[in-house]
């Protein structure tokens, strides 16, 4: 039986409580509306291979939400709580970029993807969900000349490729936030000497029995 909106709302609220993430009712409604948009667009444009609403909630929304507290802590420690800029590389359906834009309205989020339809979806989501802090960009990340305080990716590419391709968009004191499954020891070994991991966090995604982690990286001289 397909999950009803009430079931999804309940799963989301339980997940938010487990993550100790306090959101307003408006933000919860935006997250649910966003998932409904993904489901609708996926019927035509295949934004994601996950079609079941309950699975989409755990594998996409809650998986992305699990990274938000870590991002908020970093922004707080770095004095970037207001006016910071985040780039989500290979954003696809906007995961985690749109989720971050909903949860962190003070962060200007740009989601970049090389697939035009996916970038168009982000632009539509920004309008439909009334997110003035969200921008969709159809481009290769290597071509971006603006600078960002945080550059993130979720299951996008190897750490070496992710950092190499996006280095031109990193602000002088900027960092990379890479969302991964299992701790990618081999990928870390393949990083060039001028990029260092300075923090790693294990994530527990509510309702998902799988390994998840965030790796924080920055350039070193």
Swiss-Prot record:
GO terms for molecular function: rRNA (guanine-N7-)-methyltransferase activity. It is found in: Cytoplasm. It catalyses: guanosine(527) in 16S rRNA + S-adenosyl-L-methionine = N(7)-methylguanosine(527) in 16S rRNA + S-adenosyl-L-homocysteine. Transmembrane segments: none annotated. GO terms for cellular component: cytosol. Keywords: Cytoplasm, Methyltransferase, rRNA processing, S-adenosyl-L-methionine, Transferase. It is an enzyme of class 2 (transferase). InterPro entries: rRNA_ssu_MeTfrase_G, SAM-dependent_MTases_sf. Its main location: cytoplasm. CDD domains: AdoMet_MTases (cd02440). It comes from the Bacteria. S-adenosyl-L-methionine binds at residues 90, 95, 141-142, 154. It holds the Pfam family GidB. Its EC number is 2.1.1.170. The keyword Cytoplasm applies. Specifically methylates the N7 position of guanine in position 527 of 16S rRNA. NCBIfam families: rsmG_gidB (TIGR00138). Belongs to the methyltransferase superfamily. RNA methyltransferase RsmG family. HAMAP family: 16SrRNA_methyltr_G. This is Ribosomal RNA small subunit methyltransferase G. It comes from Polaromonas naphthalenivorans (strain CJ2).
């Amino acid at each position: 039986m397909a999950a009803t909106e009430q079931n999804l709302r309940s799963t989301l609220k339980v997940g938010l409580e487990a993550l100790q993430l306090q959101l307003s009712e408006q933000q919860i409604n935006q997250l649910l509306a966003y998932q409904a948009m993904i489901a609708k667009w996926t019927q035509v444009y295949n934004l994601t291979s996950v079609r079941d609403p309950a699975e989409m909630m755990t594998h996409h929304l809650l998986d992305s939400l699990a990274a938000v507290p870590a991002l908020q802590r970093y922004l707080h420690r770095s004095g970037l709580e207001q006016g910071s800029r985040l780039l989500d590389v290979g954003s696809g359906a906007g995961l985690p970029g749109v989720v971050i834009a909903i949860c962190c309205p003070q962060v200007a989020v740009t989601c970049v993807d090389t697939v035009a339809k996916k970038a168009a979806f982000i632009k539509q989501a920004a309008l439909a969900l009334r997110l003035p802090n969200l921008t969709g960009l159809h481009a290769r990340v290597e071509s971006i000349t603006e600078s960002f305080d945080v550059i993130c990716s979720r299951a996008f590419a190897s750490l070496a490729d992710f950092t190499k391709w996006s280095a031109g968009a990193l602000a002088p004191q900027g960092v990379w936030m890479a969302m991964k499954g299992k701790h990618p020891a081999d990928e870390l070994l393949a990083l060039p000497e001028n990029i260092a991991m300075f923090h790693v966090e294990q994530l527990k995604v509510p309702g998902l029995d799988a390994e998840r982690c965030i790796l924080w990286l920055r350039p070193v001289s």
